[in-house]
Amino acid sequence: MNKREVNVLHQELEIYREMGIPLYLNGKKSTPKRIEKAYRIAEEGVYMRDYIQDDTGRLKGLSFDFVREEEP
């Protein structure tokens, strides 16, 4: 990720945090800063974003899980 992309991600995650939406990184509660760092140093894979909703479709959490890239 370039510097601009990291800044955009940070701003987005801070908005969710301010809204009280829990953030998770690989299944554990996390912070915008930790998620940002994981994105920057990820090698041999990417982070998949998963929006967690309640029964009414309202956002109740945001999860980032590492997914390994398969070799061709």
Residue ranges and their predicted role:
Residues 7, 27-31, 54-57, 65:
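A generic structural micro-environment signature
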Residues 48-72:
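Short, compact, well-ordered microdomains
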